[in-house]
Amino acid sequence: MENILLGIVQGLTEFLPVSSSGHLAIFTAIFNKTPDVGYFAFLHLATFLAVVIFVKKEIFEIINGVFKKDEKYITLSLKLFVSMIPAAIVGIFFEDFIKSIFSETFFIGVFLAITGVFMLLSDKMDKNLKTITKIPYLDAFIIGIFQAFSVLPGISRSGSTLFAALLLGVKKEDAVKYSFLMSLPVIFGAGVLEMQKTVITKEYVYGFIVAFLTGILGLHLLKKMVIAGKLKFFGYYCFLASLFVIFYI
């Protein structure tokens, strides 16, 4: 039962801007049990697959465009690479150090509140100027910096990158697509690097399926909420989660 519940938590919170790491802390406190690292990594692969399904059209267009030497898609792929650089550097060299300092529940609560602020501000941004192929290199790097912040427990990866993209004037639907295209290597890497010597059990498979299905649901829900300008509701939720973490965990 706990494995299934963790699959639901991972599938939804990996994509909804409420911080999967913050909710992992809540899960750990409620059940007084830290989830197995290998199992959590396996769930990352489920959410990776969910993203691939969600942006399959864009992935095909980019790959096809690169092979056809279409400058627009070659440039887009390079910008996505630029966006991945900050998270890669932080993840490789500083992740363990950062988490060792900021893994206390007080900090998790504070960072959840910051994610909430991001969501409230995101709803007020409606420039809708840039499509996914018109994002400048500098903007791509800035969005990448915000993605790197998500190494802090309680900072939502999707929330921070959406906030940055909308702040920089990217169209809402394109901000969602770009956020999840640039997340693919991060999610896949998180799964593969920590799955070494993991024995996959029947319970793991059940959790994988649940995480995949709830991940698909979470992706479509987020897209609708962004377009409808209702990210503030995620912000309110983050504030409540922040208070719960600070005062009850």
From Swiss-Prot:
Enzyme Commission number(s) from the entry: 3.6.1.27
Pfam families on file: BacA
GO molecular function: undecaprenyl-diphosphatase activity
Transmembrane segments: 11-31, 35-55, 74-94, 101-121, 135-155, 175-195, 208-228, 229-249
Entry's Gene Ontology cellular component terms: plasma membrane
Record's keyword terms, sorted: Cell membrane, Hydrolase, Membrane, Transmembrane, Transmembrane helix
Signal peptide (residue range): none
The keyword RNA-binding is assigned to this record: no
Keyword Membrane: yes
Primary location: membrane
Disulfide bonds: none
Membrane topology of this protein: Multi-pass membrane protein
Catalytic activity: di-trans,octa-cis-undecaprenyl diphosphate + H2O = di-trans,octa-cis-undecaprenyl phosphate + phosphate + H(+)
Subcellular location, record wording: Cell membrane
Function statement: Catalyzes the dephosphorylation of undecaprenyl diphosphate (UPP).
Similarity comment text for this entry: Belongs to the UppP family.
Protein's recorded name: Undecaprenyl-diphosphatase
Gene that this polypeptide is encoded by: uppP
